[in-house]
């Protein structure tokens, strides 16, 4: 891709998200989402391949449907209230329509089918943008309208997302699909807590973004896309593989790593609100995610992979071109747990 065109596309992508995040007018918010969507399509199609074309088509159809549903909700709300402002309380019909539209944009279950397919059809860099930056605009809208949303609908979407995110990743061998299902599960945790504590949702989002960017940065650095190629990285880049596997454990929410902190605080907050069954169910379902992360770690570092590893240990390891800020991201993705008391005070 021409560097100038790439810069314009990236600028439009960032501008679209920023417009959505700072606007209080529904028309501007919708315009920002559209800019975001149309700039993401060429990023997905950056590699000229039938899989990337298919992924871009699926992404466009899903996002266009969600945008249409969101605009329909905005128009109905305008008809009843006569106002375009986002701070205005929504009527029940509009609330349901907007929740479903934003669930489609975020990839929440049962509107999740496009996320693994689109992520698998793109390059690692495009997949990273899709699972991190593209979550910001819809989550900002949810943050602003959370008081008008239906609690039962949000909790249903959250439980389904955590369940599907765990089940879907169990039989996967492609790392991009595993990351996609992990994203669905994490979005479920954020959706569950947004109705009770928006600060916790933001904290969860920030930690999720750090862990996901770290994982993709390490995948890009080691050119790893499957569980088989991941098992072979141990021979050439053992330090990088160790960091990758530690970040995987953090992504699964294993204490004492960073990923445990948001889950711990979400369960605590929901228990304070006299909800015991729901956080217990969420914690049990999160074990599915941890299981397939542990399976990756087991096959990579503790045993030989089912196919014989013929790669010999090298006397001189590869010189890795580290992505900028990788050491910082790895540290933040794995060692934030001592700051948890401070986070609890802030919340």
Curated annotation (Swiss-Prot):
Primary localization: mitochondrion
GO biological process, one term: mitochondrial respiratory chain complex I assembly
EC code: 7.1.1.2
Reactions listed under catalytic activity: a ubiquinone + NADH + 5 H(+)(in) = a ubiquinol + NAD(+) + 4 H(+)(out)
EC class (word): translocase
Topological type in the membrane: Multi-pass membrane protein
Function: Core subunit of the mitochondrial membrane respiratory chain NADH dehydrogenase (Complex I) which catalyzes electron transfer from NADH through the respiratory chain, using ubiquinone as an electron acceptor. Essential for the catalytic activity and assembly of complex I.
Family label: Belongs to the complex I subunit 2 family.
Protein name: NADH-ubiquinone oxidoreductase chain 2
Biological source species: Dasypus novemcinctus (Nine-banded armadillo)
């Amino acid at each position: 891709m021409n560097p100038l065109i790439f810069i314009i596309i990236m600028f439009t992508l960032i501008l679209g998200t920023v417009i959505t995040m700072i606007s209080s007018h529904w028309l501007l918010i919708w315009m920002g989402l559209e800019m975001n969507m149309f700039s993401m399509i060429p990023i997905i199609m950056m590699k000229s391949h039938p899989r990337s074309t298919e992924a871009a088509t699926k992404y466009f159809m899903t996002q266009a449907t969600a945008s249409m549903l969101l605009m329909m909700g905005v128009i109905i709300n305008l008809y009843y209230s006569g106002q375009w402002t986002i701070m205005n309380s929504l009527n029940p019909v509009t609330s349901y329509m907007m929740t479903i539209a934003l669930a489609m944009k975020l990839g929440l279950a049962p509107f999740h089918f496009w996320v693994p397919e689109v992520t698998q059809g793109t390059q690692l860099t495009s997949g990273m943008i899709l699972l991190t930056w593209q979550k910001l605009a819809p989550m900002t809208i949810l943050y602003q309208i959370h008081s008008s949303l239906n609690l039962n609908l949000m909790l249903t979407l959250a439980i389904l997302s955590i369940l599907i995110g765990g089940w879907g990743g169990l039989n996967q061998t492609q790392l991009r699909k595993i990351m996609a299902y992990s994203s669905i599960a994490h979005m479920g945790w954020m959706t569950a807590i947004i109705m009770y504590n928006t600060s916790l949702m933001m904290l969860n989002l920030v930690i999720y973004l750090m862990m996901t960017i770290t994982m993709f940065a390490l995948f890009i650095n080691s050119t790893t896309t499957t569980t088989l190629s991941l098992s072979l990285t141990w021979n050439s880049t053992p330090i990088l593989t160790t960091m990758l596997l530690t970040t995987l454990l953090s992504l699964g929410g294993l204490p004492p790593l960073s990923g445990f902190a948001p889950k711990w605080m979400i369960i605590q907050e929901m228990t304070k609100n006299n909800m015991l069954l729901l956080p217990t169910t969420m914690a049990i379902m999160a074990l599915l995610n941890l299981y397939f992360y542990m399976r990756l770690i087991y096959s990579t570092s503790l045993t030989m992979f089912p196919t014989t590893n013929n790669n010999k240990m090298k006397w001189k390891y590869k010189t890795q071109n580290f992505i900028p800020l990788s050491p910082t991201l790895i540290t933040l993705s794995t060692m934030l747990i001592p700051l948890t008391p401070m986070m609890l005070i802030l919340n």
